[in-house]
Swiss-Prot record:
Pfam family, one: Pribosyl_synth
Keywords, in A-Z order: ATP-binding, Cytoplasm, Kinase, Magnesium, Metal-binding, Nucleotide biosynthesis, Nucleotide-binding, Transferase
Subcellular localization(s) per the UniProt record: Cytoplasm
Residues involved in Mg(2+) binding: D131, H133, E146
Primary gene name: prsB
Name of this protein: Ribose-phosphate pyrophosphokinase B
Organism: Dictyostelium discoideum
Entry-linked PANTHER family: RIBOSE-PHOSPHATE DIPHOSPHOKINASE FAMILY MEMBER, RIBOSE-PHOSPHATE PYROPHOSPHOKINASE 2
InterPro entries, A to Z: Pribosyltran_N, PRibTrfase_dom, PRTase-like, Rib-P_diPkinase
Length: 329
């Protein structure tokens, strides 16, 4: 158990979530001013003592200013370290650059590893994050990384829907790609439901029998039965939302009566909200790992569930030296 006082600070990425976490822990957010100089450099002023405290900085590195939010985090950590904070934990619900975690083409950087190096160099002692795009990213760090899963939140939500709306209607959990099968299966196992997988394969087609030109088309293959059932798509990131739209269209075509989607991180780039509004999805559920209240006003299908209780409990256990494994069960 830590004898050091727990203090929460935040940058400009998600003040609302920080305050909700503080409320769950029966404390208040610390006093820090994060702004910019006239030449756009990041300025951080910590207006209270952090000497010997167990400091938690809540800062998702998300849109609309991924790089600014990352820089704010690093500068805050440096300031706190120089002010003799006992331990610094970065609470990064959405970990920016997580999708750049491998060398997928010649001369490509592994930017996620670079970000991990920067965070360690700044002086971060521990990272708390949620549903990393790839769990192997934890290995990029030489410090503890607590990757909290949203499975319990999603399972609880589906069980509530089952009692209030689904009633006796069968439902099936769907992974929109091969890469997300493990995530979807974990939820289907807890709900004792069926699992379906959407596989999108490129198939080469010739323009004509006499032509030497060919092109690739995307072929959607559904593994599993959704006929007459409610399909529930499980994914970690909703970015352009084209995948969700194509998946919902394919599921309806295969006989699903309704399509729901539960996604951890709502990135929503470009016209993603318009794409969701135009899709066959009945309801899209996301967490508040990224601020999305403005998008909720534009999309009646969008529902946001809070992760404040999960993150606050993780922080409490880290502070007291308790196991965090059971939180995701």
């Amino acid at each position: 158990m830590s004898n050091n006082r727990l203090v929460i600070l935040h940058g400009n990425a998600h003040p609302k979530l920080s305050k909700e976490i503080a409320s769950c822990l029966n404390t208040e957010v610390g006093n820090a001013l994060v702004s910019k100089f006239a030449n756009s450099e990041t300025q951080v002023i910590i207006n209270e003592s952090v000497r010997d405290v167990d400091l938690y900085i809540v800062q998702p590195t998300c849109n609309p200013s991924v790089n600014d939010y990352l820089m704010e985090l690093l500068v805050m950590v440096d300031g706190a370290k120089r002010a003799s904070a006992h331990r610094i934990t970065a609470v990064v619900p959405f970990f920016g650059y997580a999708r750049q975690s491998k060398k997928d083409k010649s001369r490509a950087p592994i930017t996620c590893k670079l970000v991990a190096n920067m965070m360690e160099a700044a002086g971060i002692d521990r990272v708390i994050t949620m549903d990393l795009h790839s769990s192997q990213i934890q290995g990029f760090f030489n410090i503890p990384v607590e990757n909290v899963y949203t499975e319990p939140l999603f399972v609880k939500y589906i069980k509530k829907k089952k009692k209030t709306e689904f009633l006796n209607q069968e439902f099936v959990i769907v992974s929109p790609g091969v890469g997300g099968v493990k995530r979807a299966k974990a939820i289907s196992d807890k709900l004792e439901s069926e699992l379906a997988i959407i596989h999108r394969a490129n198939k080469e087609m010739s323009l004509s029998l006499s032509s030497s030109f060919s092109f690739d088309i995307e072929e959607t293959v559904l593994v599993g039965d959704v006929t007459g059932k409610i399909a529930i798509i499980i994914d970690d990131i909703a970015d352009t939302c084209k995948t969700l739209k194509l998946a919902s269209k394919a599921l309806i075509k295969k006989g699903a009566i309704k399509v729901y989607a539960l996604v951890t991180h709502g990135v929503f780039s470009n016209n993603a909200i318009d794409i969701i509004n135009d899709s066959s999805i009945t309801e899209l559920v996301i967490t508040d790992s990224i601020p999305n209240e403005h998008n909720k006003e534009k999309c009646p299908k969008l529902k946001i569930i809070s992760i404040a209780s999960v993150l606050s409990e993780t922080m409490r256990r880290c502070h007291h030296g308790e196991s965090v494994t059971s939180i995701s069960k």
